[in-house]
């Protein structure tokens, strides 16, 4: 019995999933192919069994899915107001579309509130056969999405630092902490010792990494961070954090922000408080979005090549969909771009 539930490579089979869910193999096919009539409860039981067994229909995707949709999903877990104020995702989408559109692929964008809603959406998209794959953003510790998508038979790529142990291909610049390290060194060379950091949500892996590199770089130089504040990336949170920092008895002489959008808010808050940037407080962003080049003063920031990463992610996902695409490797790292928002302490 056990042998019939595993293939020659020792991997679980569709029969094993069917047996675990108490259904026929045809029902398993219907659950992943959105054909036939099965109840939502049965579909859920099949998907749970597939996930528990670690079974993916990707090896038999051609048999289970009669046609490609030529549509890929981008699901973003952000409030609409935060997404609307942050050009990061516009840059990412530009990079994705630059590779998808010429090949006749479209991008399906969804906004969700939490991980449960995001997981349910992937399950629905897979069951309805609406997309051929998904681009995952905002990697988290113990991220449930990669194994879920593998179980659903949906190709996926995860944006972030390359991780050979990741359950799905990861696409991003290497040495993610390099830009933060450069930024701290730059500020210290300018004489700054009271340096604060405005971080993003703590559950995001890239947020944790950047914050850790910021703190470690300072401590290695014998300097304590002036403050580290956590936000949700929103404009309101960035303004509140900046006002808190500027109200300190010994206010920071420099503030680093987790993205350019918050840095722009920070510059505005400082100027409204009557402070000059960079004469009274230096500001550093992260992303190198176009808006930073049009500010006064122009924003010093870390360039993580968002469009280029988006393009590489699209190529990696297209390759999984059977398309002939160029190499997806990114042989670069985030780099500091020095402009006029930083100056001597």
Residue ranges and their predicted role:
Residues 2-7, 20, 52, 98-102, ...:
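Bacterial carbohydrate/catabolite-sensing allosteric modules
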Residues 1-70, 345:
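N-terminal helix-turn-helix DNA-binding module of bacterial transcription factors
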Residues 113-116, 137-142, 261:
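Short beta->alpha connector loops
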Residues 27, 67-81, 186, 194-201:
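Short beta-strand segments enriched in small/hydrophobic residues
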Residues 43, 90-93, 146, 207-215:
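Short, surface-exposed alpha-helical segments at coil->helix boundaries
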């Amino acid at each position: 019995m056990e042998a019939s539930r595993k293939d020659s490579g020792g991997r679980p089979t569709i029969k094993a999933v069917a047996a675990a869910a108490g259904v026929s193999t045809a029902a398993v096919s219907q659950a992943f192919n959105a054909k036939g009539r099965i109840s939502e409860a049965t579909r859920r039981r099949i998907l749970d069994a597939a996930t528990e067994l670690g079974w993916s229909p990707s090896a038999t995707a051609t048999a289970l899915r009669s046609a490609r949709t030529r549509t890929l999903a981008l699901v973003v877990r952000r409030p609409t107001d935060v997404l609307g104020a942050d050009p990061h995702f516009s840059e990412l989408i530009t990079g994705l579309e630059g590779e998808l559109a010429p090949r006749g692929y479209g991008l399906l964008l969804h906004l969700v509130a939490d991980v449960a809603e995001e997981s349910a959406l992937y399950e629905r998209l897979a069951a309805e056969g609406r997309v051929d794959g998904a681009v995952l953003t905002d990697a988290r510790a113990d991220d449930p999405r990669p194994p879920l998508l593998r179980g659903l038979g949906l190709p996926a790529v995860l944006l972030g630092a390359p991780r050979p142990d990741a359950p799905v291909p990861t696409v991003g610049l290497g040495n993610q902490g390099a830009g933060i390290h450069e930024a701290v060194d730059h500020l210290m060379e300018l004489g700054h010792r009271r340096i604060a950091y405005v971080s993003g949500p703590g559950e995001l892996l890239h947020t944790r990494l950047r914050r850790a590199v910021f703190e470690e770089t300072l401590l290695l130089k014998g300097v304590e961070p002036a403050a580290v504040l956590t936000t949700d990336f929103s404009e309101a949170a960035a303004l509140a954090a900046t006002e808190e920092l500027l109200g300190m008895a010994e206010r920071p002489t420099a503030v680093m922000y987790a993205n350019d959008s918050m840095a722009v808010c920070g510059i505005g808050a400082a100027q409204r408080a009557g402070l000059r940037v960079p004469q009274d407080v230096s500001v550093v962003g992260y992303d190198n979005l176009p808006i930073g080049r049009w500010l006064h003063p122009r924003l010093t920031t870390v360039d993580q090549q968002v469009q280029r990463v988006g393009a590489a992610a699209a190529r990696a996902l297209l390759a999984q969909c059977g398309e002939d695409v160029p190499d997806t490797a990114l042989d670069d790292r985030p780099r500091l771009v020095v402009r006029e928002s930083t100056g001597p302490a």
